[in-house]
């Protein structure tokens, strides 16, 4: 009995320090963030310029890093919440260094908490 109070106190402290589940991404913020990132790419800005602006957007896109040019894109009207992240499908038209243009179906995974991060999902369907 004399150990019950200290044990309960320790348990309360431990449980009080544990964070709850992470917040889900804000779907109303995800779409405009993705559009801003795609417009930056299309206009010739670098990924670093996108990260340096306010609000900062981190976009991990290999084709952009490889200096493929985004000629055009078409986002689906709505993204979907998948787990705690937003998934948005986009038709993109890319031009490589030789000038050849190709259409691609892309799927972007967007997180808005604690910061805006956009990653192209090359493995998902």
Provide a role label for each language-model segment.
Residues 32-71:
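Post-signal-peptide N-terminal segment of Sec-exported extracytoplasmic proteins
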Residues 13-16:
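C-terminal motif of bacterial Sec signal peptides marking the signal peptidase cleavage site
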Residues 24-32:
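Soluble non-cytosolic domains of exported or imported proteins
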Residues 18-20:
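Bacterial signal peptide processing site
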Residues 81-125:
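Exposed beta-sheet edge and beta->alpha loop/turn motif
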Residues 72-77:
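Short structured motifs
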Residues 1-4:
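Positively charged n-region of N-terminal signal peptides that target proteins for export
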């Amino acid at each position: 009995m004399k150990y019950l109070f200290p044990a309960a106190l320790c348990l309360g402290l431990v449980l009080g320090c544990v964070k709850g589940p992470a917040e889900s991404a804000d779907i109303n913020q995800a779409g405009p963030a993705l559009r801003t990132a795609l417009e930056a790419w299309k206009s010739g800005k670098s990924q670093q310029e996108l990260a340096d602006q306010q609000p900062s957007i981190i976009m991990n896109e290999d084709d952009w890093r490889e200096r493929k040019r985004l000629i055009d894109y078409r986002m689906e009207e709505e993204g979907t919440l998948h787990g705690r992240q937003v998934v948005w499908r986009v038709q993109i038209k890319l031009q490589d260094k030789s000038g050849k243009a190709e259409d691609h179906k892309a799927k972007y995974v967007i997180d808005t908490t604690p910061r805006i991060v956009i990653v192209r999902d090359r493995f998902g369907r």
